[in-house]
């Protein structure tokens, strides 16, 4: 945190806690291809948004079944006139919101984001099963 320090560390207490620490289970990965590649691109007009919802089951009954989340990664290909006009928000089944990409007023690039990974840890510990929502918003620069 840039505003607050963390004080002095009690090395003895830290060592005692470390000896009792329970480790996490091995890393598991569960992948969903939400929008098949053969679907036509979606057009989002300035000032509007596109909402993509999908259901995840956490790879239930598979060797890589998940019961809680550590991080989520969304990989997208997006073409736009102004990249800075885009905002991406992911909403979990528990209604936690995570902004994956904020509006950026100084980003006027039109270079596409091709297979671009957006990662978040805001859903840490949540159950992955249920309805997920990805909102892609496009603001209208002229309305600033």
PLM feature spans:
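Short solvent-exposed strand-capping/beta-turn motif centered on an Asx-Ser/Thr pair
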Residues: 77-81, 93, 139
